[in-house]
Structures are given as C-alpha cells and as structure tokens.
C-alpha cells in the first residue's frame, strides 16, 4: 500500500516539477538574453582599443560582470535566487563563450595573430624572450603557440641582420633586443657620464639586464659595445 501511495504522489508531483523547471529555464534564458548585449558592448569597446587573446577577453568580461553588471538589480536578484552560485556562473560562462566563439569565427579574436603582434611590439621595445613568454602566458596564450610565434619572429628578424643561415636566429634577435633595452635604459656602453660615476655601476647595469630576462652572455655582450653602424638594418 505504501508503494502505491508513493508512486501516486510521485506521479502527481511530476507535472508541477516540470513546470518549475520550465519556468526556471525560461527565466534563465531571459536573463541571458539581457546579459549578452551588455557583454557584446563591452567586448567591442575593448577590442576597439586593445588587441586581445581569447582568454584575456574572457577575463575582461568576467571582471565586467562582477564589477558593473551585478550593480543591476535584475541580475543581482536573479543570482540571489539561485540555491548556489554554480547556476549563475554557468549562465555567465555560456554567454561569454558564445560571444568569444562568434568573434573567433569573425577573426576579431585570434591568439596566433595576437601573439605575433605582441612579440613584434615588445621586441621593438627591447623585451627579452623570457619576458615576452611570461607576458603572453599571463594573457592566456598557450606555451606551444608562444614558442612557435617566437621562433617565426626570430627567423624573420634575423634574416634582415645576417646572411649566414647557420646563425642562431634566437641569439641574433635576443642580442638585438638586449641592445635596444640597454640603449633605452642608458646601460653599459650607452650609459651617460653621470651614470658611470655611480658606485658599482657596471654590476648594477648587468643585474638590470638579467632581471629583464636576458641571459648572462647576451647581457654582457650588449653592455660591452654598441653595434657597428647599420649592422642591425
């Protein structure tokens, strides 16, 4: 008798449970529809000002949701009604992933192009390979892609510097970057007369190069003497 009663109760509660789930799904869809335009406005505004990897854009949009979107009672109240935050986080994650997927298809977000452009810019400023790698990793670019982009950039750059195909492309590019860094910071052979009068200036300049990510041999060579005229193109 107890089994029959239990089954009857379960059968009677099923339509109500379905209605509850249906209403919850409808509300979630409505909230997501309201959220996506706000995410899209933020994403397009950001991409219009800065290049970005997919992972970095995802972080930007997550921060935007936490800092700005949640000020709206509509979204704050919906999150508060959830038994836990997992449902809300899943809704936000789905909306962001949908947006980034669309932008990737349109070419607005491309990790390979982003890595190449960042490497070109940072090398021009005298950044070491280690510094560039750490920077791109912090932006969510995968290590294999970073290595591939660096190798391509090194080969392209060194082709304009040396004619010997046996020359190590990475060493050539790293030395050129180290010299740029030293020149910008007035280190080593680029130091001013005032800078050379400071105590222990040579050791301090070398330490600065090492902290910037350059290897010892490259740093010593970059600090020792300026390149011959026009040797770097």
For the regions a language model picked out, list residue spans one by one.
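An alpha-helical, amphipathic repeat domain used for nucleic-acid recognition
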Residues: 1-233
């Amino acid at each position: 008798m107890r089994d029959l009663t239990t089954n009857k109760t379960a059968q009677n509660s099923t339509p109500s449970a379905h209605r509850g789930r249906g209403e919850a799904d409808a509300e979630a869809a409505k909230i997501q529809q309201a959220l996506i335009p706000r995410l899209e406005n933020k994403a397009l505004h950001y991409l219009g000002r800065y290049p970005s990897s997919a992972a970095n854009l995802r972080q930007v949009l997550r921060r935007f949701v936490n800092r700005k979107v949640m000020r709206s009672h509509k979204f704050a109240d919906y999150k508060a009604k959830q038994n836990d935050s997992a449902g809300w986080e899943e809704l936000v994650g789905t909306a962001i992933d949908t947006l980034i997927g669309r932008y990737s298809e349109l070419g607005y977000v491309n990790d390979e192009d982003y890595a190449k452009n960042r490497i070109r810019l940072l090398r021009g400023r005298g950044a070491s390979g280690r510094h560039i790698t750490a920077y791109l990793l912090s932006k969510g670019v995968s290590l294999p892609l970073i290595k591939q982009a660096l190798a391509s950039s090194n080969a392209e750059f060194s082709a304009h510097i040396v004619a010997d195909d046996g020359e190590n492309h990475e060493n050539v590019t790293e030395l050129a970057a180290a010299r740029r860094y030293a020149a910008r910071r007035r280190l080593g052979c680029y130091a001013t007369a005032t800078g050379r009068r400071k105590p222990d200036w040579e050791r301090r300049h070398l330490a600065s190069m090492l902290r910037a990510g350059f290897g010892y041999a490259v740093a010593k060579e970059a600090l020792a003497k300026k390149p011959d005229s026009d040797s770097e193109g």
